[in-house]
Amino acid sequence: MEPINAAIVGPGNIGTDLLAKLERVDSIAVQYVVGVVESDGLERARAKGISASAGGVDWLLEQDPLPEIVFEATSAKAHQLNAPRYHELNIQAVDLTPAHIGPMVCPPVNLTHHIDAPNVSMITCGGQATIPMVHAVSRVSAVPYAEIVASVASRGAGPGTRANIDEFTQTTGQAVSEVGGAARGRAIIILNPMEPPMIMRDTVYCMIDADADRDAISESVHRMVTEVQAYVPGYRLRADPQFDDPKDGWDGHGRVAIFLEVEGNGDYLPKYAGNLDIMTAAAARVGDSIARNRMGVPA
């Protein structure tokens, strides 16, 4: 069966790394790569025999055939303008910006729940790294509040990431609740200027029932790490989950802290850019499921 035609809009760090990952996905054939200025990403696409243009989405939507799936790695504001145009032409969009137009998807949590949606949000890099852990806890104990802190190498944060900091914190905090299963969520991002650059590190704090089964939570966390490692091999715990008994101000709840690190695969981006790598790996996994659904093939 022929693979589904796809396009990448935004040939920056994320878009170019995504292209490398999609080359390993049998259900997808990237036919177009689009930007608004000439770039290394466009040149790399052309070198692979892919139609690439700096003519933007206007150029893309004039092509024949049109792509069936678009992966957008531009900015939240750009995607808000482009998304209605894709929808009008029945092009499914996988949104790697924090625009959050469609339902939010995290592969090990709700990969197939929104497979027919015209637009799916990949949340943020911090969301893809930490929401699996919040979900791992919330499937064992009620989580009235969860907070995530994502620390990424400053050198690995391009202009798109920096321009979207506000959207990052808002969208990630919302997803910690809606997708992760916490009653309330909050997100913080830190751009770490250390040289040489450090790989992505994340801390997840979840309030839990005072009598929650700690062994069951730990087992759930370790099981979830294995699920994420199926598509992000560099995803790992830095230590076993750490538990705290209830303290003043915690309304009788205990707390679990989970410490993560994410090393990139090194496809296009350096290995320290695990924050970007987990986004592209998750998007490739979601795109594969969407493509197989369109083909009528089990994911």
Curated annotation (Swiss-Prot):
Sorted alphabetically, which SUPFAM superfamilies does this protein's record hold? Glyceraldehyde-3-phosphate dehydrogenase-like, C-terminal domain, NAD(P)-binding Rossmann-fold domains
Q: Which residues form the active site?
A: C125
Matches recorded under SMART domains: Semialdhyde_dh (SM00859)
Swiss-Prot/TrEMBL GO biological process terms:
catabolic process
Query: What range does the record give for the signal peptide?
Result: none
What keywords are annotated for this sequence in UniProt?
Aromatic hydrocarbons catabolism, NAD, Oxidoreductase, Plasmid
- The catalytic activity of this protein is classed by the Enzyme Commission as 1.2.1.10
Record-listed NAD(+) binding positions: G156, A157, G158, P159, G160, T161, R162, A163, N164, N275
Has UniProt tagged this entry with the keyword Phosphoprotein? no
Translocase: is it a keyword of this entry?
A: no
Q: Which reaction does it catalyse?
A: acetaldehyde + NAD(+) + CoA = acetyl-CoA + NADH + H(+)
InterPro entries recorded = Acetaldehyde_dehydrogenase, Acetylaldehyde_DH_C, NAD(P)-bd_dom_sf, Semialdehyde_DH_NAD-bd
Instruction: Fetch the Gene3D superfamilies from UniProt.
Output: Dihydrodipicolinate Reductase, domain 2 (3.30.360.10), NAD(P)-binding Rossmann-like Domain (3.40.50.720)
Q: Which GO terms describe its molecular function?
A: acetaldehyde dehydrogenase (acetylating) activity; NAD binding
Q: Which family does it belong to?
A: Belongs to the acetaldehyde dehydrogenase family.
HAMAP family attached here?
Ac_ald_DH_ac
**What is the protein name given in its UniProt record?**
Acetaldehyde dehydrogenase 6
Q: Which organism is it from?
A: Rhodococcus jostii (strain RHA1)
Provide the organism lineage as a comma list: Bacteria, Bacillati, Actinomycetota, Actinomycetes, Mycobacteriales
